């Protein structure tokens, strides 16, 4: 009788255990592993691909620890790359252009500042030239997440005044964005997060400044998003040196551009900025003030 009960128990428990094991595997698969577990730890990631986007712009793809890993970077945050270059530790911030939903890899689009191309910076960019010199299989150290802003979805932003302060929550219906050059990467990160959620009705207005038309980073990605989400994403360019047949603005960011292409102050939008410090200090902030956007609703990455 005992043997029969033992056999019966085995017959009953085996399917239950099988189902339990299957559910546990599915649960583990649905919760991807996070690479950036602590902002205080450096993670060595391997270069697995390089794409030439233009004469001075590259897309670098780095492998995460496993095909099941995501980077684990909240929307609005950035990472730091660090490397020993000519005997000195060089650290630079970057915002990935890949989605944090992407498993197994992270993409960075970086403009390479070559030496002897800009008279004010004859040595060029240390980190960007180092990345350009990397071979497939080489590694570099990532650290993060870092930053004072996190987009939590549905128009809600958590913004810390400084690293030691608790975040202040700002909920908006529209977001104004002013980007200059490589400052487009954090904007694209936020725009993608908003557009991929059909229940997020936040409207994004992007004013993107560059020197020439060929300098416009990530233009195909931006225009694809605009075409797919025309009601929620408004895109406008301005160039320092525009071609003759140019449908957008020409010149530095000014009061008129902000009035025409960013949401009005009456909507109480949040205005995000990212670009060269002189652009933020002399073009963005004074003209935003003239239009009527209060400082507490403006944030510079």
UniProtKB/Swiss-Prot annotation:
PANTHER family: NADH-CYTOCHROME B5 REDUCTASE, NADH-CYTOCHROME B5 REDUCTASE 3
GO cellular component, one term: endoplasmic reticulum membrane
Name of the protein: NADH-cytochrome b5 reductase 3
Residues with lipid group (N-myristoyl glycine): 2
PROSITE patterns hit by this protein: FAD_FR (PS51384)
Keywords: Acetylation, Cholesterol biosynthesis, Cholesterol metabolism, Endoplasmic reticulum, FAD, Flavoprotein, Lipid biosynthesis, Lipid metabolism, Lipoprotein, Membrane, Mitochondrion, Mitochondrion outer membrane, Myristate, NAD, Oxidoreductase, Phosphoprotein, Steroid biosynthesis, Steroid metabolism, Sterol biosynthesis, Sterol metabolism
Membrane topology category: Lipid-anchor
GO molecular function: cytochrome-b5 reductase activity, acting on NAD(P)H; FAD binding
Chain positions recorded as FAD binding sites: 92-94, 109, 111, 114, 126-128, 185
Residues modified to Phosphotyrosine: 43
Xref: InterPro entries: CBR-like, Cbr1-like_FAD-bd_dom, FAD-bd_FR_type, Flavoprot_Pyr_Nucl_cyt_Rdtase, FNR_nucleotide-bd, OxRdtase_FAD/NAD-bd, Riboflavin_synthase-like_b-brl
SUPFAM superfamilies hit by this protein: Ferredoxin reductase-like, C-terminal NADP-linked domain, Riboflavin synthase domain-like
Localisation per UniProt entry: Endoplasmic reticulum membrane; Mitochondrion outer membrane
Its job: Catalyzes the reduction of two molecules of cytochrome b5 using NADH as the electron donor.
Domain of life according to the entry: Eukaryota
Start and end residues of each FAD-binding FR-type domain: 40-152
The reaction(s) this protein catalyses: 2 Fe(III)-[cytochrome b5] + NADH = 2 Fe(II)-[cytochrome b5] + NAD(+) + H(+)
Gene name per UniProt: CYB5R3
Principal location: endoplasmic reticulum
């Amino acid at each position: 009788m005992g043997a029969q009960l033992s056999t019966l128990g085995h017959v009953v428990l085996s399917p239950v255990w099988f189902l339990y094991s299957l559910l546990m595997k599915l649960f583990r698969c649905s919760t991807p592993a996070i690479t950036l577990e602590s902002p205080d730890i450096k993670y060595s990631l391997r270069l697995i691909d390089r794409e030439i986007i233009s004469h001075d712009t590259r897309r670098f793809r780095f492998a995460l620890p496993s095909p099941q890993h995501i980077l684990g970077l909240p929307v609005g945050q950035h990472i730091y790359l660090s490397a020993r270059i000519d005997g000195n530790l060089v650290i630079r911030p970057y915002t990935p252009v890949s989605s944090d939903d992407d498993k197994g890899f992270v993409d960075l689009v970086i403009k390479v500042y070559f030496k002897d191309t800009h008279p004010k910076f004859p040595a060029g960019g240390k980190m960007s030239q180092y990345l350009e010199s990397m071979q497939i299989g080489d590694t570099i150290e990532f650290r993060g997440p870092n930053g004072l802003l996190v987009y939590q979805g549905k128009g809600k932003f958590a913004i810390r005044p400084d690293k030691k302060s608790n975040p202040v929550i700002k909920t908006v219906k529209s977001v104004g964005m002013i980007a200059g050059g490589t400052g487009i990467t954090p904007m694209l990160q936020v725009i993608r997060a908003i557009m991929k959620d059909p229940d997020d009705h936040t409207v994004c207005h992007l004013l993107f400044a560059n020197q020439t038309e060929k300098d416009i980073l990530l233009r195909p990605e931006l225009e694809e998003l605009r075409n797919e989400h025309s009601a929620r994403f408004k895109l406008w360019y301005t160039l320092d040196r525009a071609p003759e047949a140019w449908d957008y603005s020409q010149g530095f960011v000014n009061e008129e551009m902000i009035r025409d292409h960013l949401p009005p102050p009456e909507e109480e939008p949040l205005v995000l900025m990212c670009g060269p410090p002189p652009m933020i200090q002399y073009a963005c902030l004074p003209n935003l003030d003239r239009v009527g956007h209060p400082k507490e609703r403006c944030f510079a990455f």
